[in-house]
Design a protein with these regions (language model features):
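Extended, Lys/Arg-enriched charged tracts that mediate electrostatic binding to polyanionic substrates
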Residues: 141-151, 155
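Charged, gly/pro-rich active-site loop segments
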Residues: 132-143
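Intrinsically disordered, low-complexity linker/loop segments enriched in Gly/Pro
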Residues: 135, 155-157
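Helix-start/capping segments and mature chain N-termini
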Residues: 10-132, 160-245
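Short, Lys/Arg-enriched N-terminal segments with co-localized hydrophobic residues
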Residues: 1-9
Length: 245
């Protein structure tokens, strides 16, 4: 019962005007939708909004492309970055559906607060999300297992290597067409030495560094023929906490 929350287009009071820079030509014909590799193909548009001088401003939807950012940006040095992940689906009638998008929005702000990142305005988030879904609607394919992966994220962009919270940030949304992540049975192993989080840490936040720390033990598990890890508590490794996806 995933399709319980139909997106309500144009339902947000537009207190903030989002500028749209349109593409010259879609890249959709370059993508093989029958053989997608998760997270490698991206739609025509992306959203970005910058935090400067104490407020979020200049929300823009633009063609997907590279960023220009200082090598001294604090995201590179202190890992001030959080993200979310959710999916949009299209039914056989062409309607687009989301599953509890407000929960994902609330969680990215909760994660941001834990990493001293300013919260993002709800009305801008949903206006941007709705507008992008309309622009990229052809990238959402109907049928079992097909979806559009939605990746909102925030990074610290202030230039400087002092160990302190950034004063500037960039909030972005990317779309990536997706199919089922696993095509068959999934083999898991229970972690006996490594932990995903510790008491008082940032385990409850979707912080970028949490995932980087999982890569090494997950690679060890894959070398042994497993797909993912069941994480245990950090004190005794006796109690199950969560599974990787």
């Amino acid at each position: 019962l995933l399709f319980t929350a139909k997106i309500k287009f144009m339902s947000i009071i537009k207190n903030h005007s989002i500028s749209v820079k349109h593409i010259e030509k879609s890249r959709i014909d370059e993508v093989d939708f029958n053989h997608l590799i998760f997270g490698e193909d991206f739609t025509d548009y992306m959203f970005e909004c910058d935090f400067r001088n104490g407020s979020w401003g200049n929300p823009t939807i633009k063609p997907f492309g590279n960023l220009s950012i200082s090598p001294a940006a604090k995201v590179f040095h202190y890992g001030q970055a959080v993200f979310e992940g959710m999916k949009a689906y299209k039914d056989e009638q062409g309607k687009i559906w989301l599953f509890r998008p407000e929960d994902n929005f609330n969680r990215i702000n909760k994660s941001s607060k834990r990493l001293a990142i300013p919260e993002f305005p709800k009305e801008i988030f949903f206006e941007a999300l709705e507008s992008m879904l309309l622009l990229d609607k052809d990238w959402i394919k109907p049928g079992f297992g097909n979806s559009l992966y939605i990746r909102p994220f925030v990074i610290a962009t202030e230039s400087g290597v002092s160990a302190s919270p950034s004063s500037e940030y960039k909030f972005m949304i990317l779309f990536s067409p997706a199919q089922a992540y696993y095509s068959g049975d999934v083999k898991v192993v229970i972690a006996e030495h490594f932990s995903r989080s510790a008491d008082g840490g940032v385990g409850a936040a979707k912080a970028a560094g949490n995932y980087a720390a999982q890569f090494y033990p997950t690679n060890l598990a894959k070398e042994q023929g497993f797909h993912q890890v069941i994480w245990t508590d950090s004190n005794e490794h006796k109690y199950l906490e969560e599974a990787g996806t």
